[in-house]
Regions:
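Hydrophobic alpha-helical transmembrane segments in multi-pass integral membrane proteins
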Residues: 51-55, 113-126, 183-195
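Selective transmembrane alpha-helices of multi-pass membrane proteins
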Residues: 62-93, 148-154, 158, 166-195
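Flexible cytoplasmic inter-helical loops of multi-pass small-molecule transporters
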Residues: 89-103
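Residue-level signature of transmembrane alpha-helical cores of multipass secondary-active transporters
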Residues: 6-10, 43, 108-112, 144-151, ...
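Hydrophobic/aromatic residues within the transmembrane alpha-helices of Major Facilitator Superfamily
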Residues: 11, 15, 49, 85, ...
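Primarily residues marking transmembrane-helix entry/exit sites
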Residues: 2-3, 101-105, 118, 137-144, ...
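Juxtamembrane transmembrane-helix termini in multi-pass membrane transport proteins
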Residues: 2-70, 124-143
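Alpha-helical transmembrane segments and their lipid-water interface positions
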Residues: 20, 46-58, 80-83, 119, ...
Length: 195
């Protein structure tokens, strides 16, 4: 397994802006960390369910259509390159604040089922880095737990450091995006070179 590429992909994807992280940051800025923790726990729970579903979906595809592994690797690498380009050219979006909304556990959990970033994160990480090397039930469960934990940690970090990240991203947004994009680009290219 390309362990460095795996870790880079996992951490870059989990810690860059996405629906979970932005909602956690805004909620923590507005309601405080303690109230936002319910949302974060919901995100972690939903994340775990999605990672398990992605694991067994990928395993089913590999066992049903063994030749799909190479195609899944190519697709995953192209998706990672797409993400890198999207990160480089992303612009700050207007943040709509609704003073009456406090995102809870159920909101955080259900968000994962419609969050394309999490679903593609799971499919990409598992099909590229895990299934080709470890496909026992124990491995799939442990990697799903790891991926869910890192996703949960990313969301918690965005809520803990919400105001600091907001200032940082406002001031250094393009540099931050460039570094994250280059790390994703490195991961995608190293995967393709291993095949």
């Amino acid at each position: 397994m390309a362990f460095v590429s795996f870790l880079l992909y996992v951490f870059v994807t989990a810690f860059t802006p996405g629906p979970n992280n932005i909602m956690a940051m805004l909620s923590a800025n507005k309601y405080g960390f303690k109230r936002t923790m319910k949302f974060c726990l919901g995100v972690g729970t939903g994340f775990l369910v999605i990672m398990l579903l992605c694991s067994y979906f990928n395993l089913l595809l590999k066992n049903t259509i063994p030749k799909i592994e190479f195609s899944m690797t190519i697709f995953s690498s192209i998706y990672m390159l797409y993400l890198a380009i999207k990160i480089i050219f992303s612009k700050e979006k207007n943040k709509e604040k609704d003073d009456k909304k406090n995102y809870g556990f159920l909101t955080g959990m259900l968000l994962q089922f419609i969050n394309p970033k999490v679903i593609l994160y799971g499919i990409t990480a598992i099909s590229t880095f895990i299934i080709p090397f470890n496909n026992s039930n124990f491995s799939l469960i442990m990697y799903s737990l790891f991926l869910a934990f890192v996703g949960f940690a990313g969301t918690v970090c965005w809520s803990v450091f919400g105001s600091m990240f907001q200032i940082f991203l406002t001031r250094y947004r393009s540099k931050f995006n460039l570094v994250m994009a280059l790390l994703l680009f490195y991961s995608a290219v190293s995967i393709l070179l291993e095949k």
